[in-house]
């Protein structure tokens, strides 16, 4: 017969004589190995009628306790007749196998190595010394066995892992704990063993875990120093000089040694005091786990586990042990023991024991008890108790064959836990935990007939001795069994067997090599993903466990969410419907949690109508009940001043000189050293469409403010006529600014830096009215110098006041001059001009507009001890005033730039009125400048903002376009505008490429459209033709807009597509061409004038082109005709026809100039 000789796939055949006489066997000569001098003492054969004592049972007698040896029969650790865990080989003839018996049980009498007998150095379960036969008359082969054939080193004889001398407990050739291939058929002590460490007479079947046919020393066999050896340091071993080996804990006779499992004083299973399963010297019997003193299953006076004494508390002993027979042991038969025989034991014989015996029973049998006639009681009266009880473990119906009940947990019939029928724990027929069948009338404790833990007959008990099922350590399929699927068996499913064992070579072992159908870890055909049910088959990485099937990694078909490897479907968290996620859900948002403010369900905290409840103390004063923003206590700084580093005040209140703190860390934007994030030259990533994104405004350094200054004196018409609406207005006729005698030298120097040598007509006309304190309304075409026209006189006034109040410090930002403009770009441009003009004068200029980080904006305004000039948009100004960040109490002068929008009641008029008040109440001087004023504004809105007697100044005519702009009007239907723009710019409409000498290559062009979205689209179309193009609109954040405008001004881009944000006030140097791709609406007269006014500024000439759709732009055509006429431009005939009937009376808004 062949079997696995190394437990890993290789096969070998070893034939052994049927009967081996007891004699010393010389060791083989092994030059590389150092032999040991220790020899094995022989032991007499044990009588098969000797009571059993191991973790296992005896089919003939009935023991009462768990590990007791007071009666011939045994259960869990009983007398040494059956060969269970820690069993004895004495009953081998009747029981065939033990899990720790004298022969080759776990913890047997062998000596050397882990399962070995001899003394070879560093062998794993090996032995090399010739010794006398152990008690069974054969060499040991099991786990801790003695060598049958001494043959070389570990893993060297026939390459077996469990070989004769150094195998993992093996003595011959095969498997995990298998013995050699012997043929002896003796019965009794020399029976073949199959348990873990069991010893039996060899048969045609290979041996089990830790066994060898006809050999004594399995796991803890008969040698000396093995794991459980018999001499000094074995795990449960026998003392030197012992005549018997008894499996796991051994029996001692004379002296003792202190090995691990030795029989001396401190060994694990030692024989005197504290061993695990040790027994006393001179004891008549050795019964596996129970030994003499304090061992696990000890026998004599101390307190061993399952000891048999009557005075101590051994676990399972006679007195108080676990399963003891006297007083209060675990399973004892007296009064309060666990499973005692009287009343309250766990499994006691009276009324309330769990597993108690039926009324009238004469014996107590520990955990599950034996019954005789009838039973009764309820829960608490029989853990495996009486047939009529219904309690925990109680039966419910009577089995006709046994007279017991069937359904109790530990009941007497079939499915009880410990019942003796079919599925009980320790039951007597099939599936008990350690059950056996000695007869159907007797059920004695945990071990029962068949599939019990340590069971004996056909099914699959732990350590059972049958030949056809899967007992743990049995002959058939036990743990270390010899036939089918034992642990270490050599047949079909054993651990380390030839078919599917651990390392088996055939079907499905660990590291299996050929069979493709089963399921070992790393089996032949599928490796870690085999077909069925081991690690790597239906387990890890296969169809039903980890990595597949219905556990970790992928669910099975019948589970919720079988997605066949696809993405797991997930419904909307808001509405529960599939097909979209919650952020795309068009249903109203449903709160899933209580409101964080009022803790009520049904609404969000942002929608809560209850007063806001602070969740902690005030961050300012530390008192509960209010927020820091509502705290009435003075604000307490949490750290040192950021300016001077001193404690006790905020940076905004710091009286020390403003100190620029050098950065101590890299810039947060570019990670470079040497500058703060707000000074970073790089720009953050564009966030298109996020127009609410704020940023830190980057100011132009003082030394670079004048780099873009251009002298345009040769292009400006200084002879333009200025008309005043009031009596006599002195308009000085000066060729240069030197004629302004009151002009301070610092201001004069700054004008030279700005390359302003001569005042423009509007600057000359507005100078003295403003200096005299009059309210002024000035109208001049774009690019005529309006900004300096109001700045120069006001700066002169501010410089005079600053000399008087130089030491005054404002508690909060309080501007003296307030300039309000409609767009951020115009605010920024005006602020830059004001900084240039006040350079080195001591005056401080600030700005405020949306898009600039609010906190940074506030800090910017607070950084001045005096704020002389503030340039702001209406929205941010209103915010700061309402929040108390800015005070207007010291304001003396107000300027409304692009005033036609600022005073229009349909635009900013209402907000401006709230800020500056009515003219009758207002003491401040007010100046309004714009490129156009309609008659309606003059009559209806201007009186609300300026005082009576104001001065109106006009350069040429109100609302006229700059004559230096060449206006072209083209009839283009809406559907043909794209082709028209391509043609106008010099782009081939078929190939979308630039034509030779394309006009766009020579002209800086600004294209206006009405749709914000179409800005980006048209810019992309033009850019695809190879023209450097960029877009600018209100949906961009302010930093994008500033950067775009700056890049276009500097010539980085040749073309820009913009919405109306670029229509007013922007000075774009060198702009050659303005295109109105879309015309303004019917109210867009002023808008058209301002759009085309971006070119032809400061005396330069420019060109404008308008695409007019006759069908859709009919409302603006009359206004357009009038503008062309007044600008002395040719009006196309088709445009005049388009005006049609609207000509008559349609231009009353453009009547002749009034008499002033």
From Swiss-Prot:
GO terms for biological process: gamete generation; maturation of SSU-rRNA; regulation of cell population proliferation. Residues 767-951 form the Helicase ATP-binding domain. Residues 1145-1156 have a biased composition (Acidic residues). Residues 986-1139 form the Helicase C-terminal domain. Keywords: ATP-binding, Helicase, Hydrolase, Metal-binding, Nucleotide-binding, Repeat, RNA-binding, Zinc, Zinc-finger. It catalyses: ATP + H2O = ADP + phosphate + H(+). Gene3D superfamilies: P-loop containing nucleotide triphosphate hydrolases, Zinc finger, CCHC-type. Disruption phenotype: Knockout with RNAi-mediated knockdown of glh-1 results in smaller P-granules and irregular cytoplasmic localization of the P-granule component pgl-3 in embryos. Quadruple RNAi-mediated knockdown with glh-1, pgl-1 and pgl-3 results in offspring that display 27-89% sterility, abnormal oocytes and do not have embryos in the uterus. These sterile offspring still produce sperm. Furthermore, these offspring may have compromised P-granule integrity as there is diffuse cytoplasmic localization of the P-granule component deps-1, which may cause germ cells to initiate somatic reprogramming. The keyword Hydrolase applies. One of its GO terms (cellular component) is P granule. A motif (Q motif) lies at residues 736-764. Its EC number is 3.6.4.13. GO terms for molecular function: ATP binding; ATP hydrolysis activity; JUN kinase binding; RNA binding; RNA helicase activity; zinc ion binding. Pfam families: DEAD, Helicase_C, zf-CCHC. Residues 24-34 have a biased composition (Pro residues). Disulfide bonds: none annotated. Residues 60-73, 194-211, 243-258, 307-319, 362-371, 395-406, 440-451, 464-476 have a biased composition (Polar residues). Interacts (via C-terminus) with kgb-1. Belongs to the DEAD box helicase family. DDX4/VASA subfamily. Probable ATP-binding RNA helicase. May act redundantly with the P-granule component glh-1 to regulate the formation of the granular structure of P-granules in embryos. May protect somatic cells from excessive apoptosis during normal development. This is ATP-dependent RNA helicase glh-4. It comes from Caenorhabditis elegans.
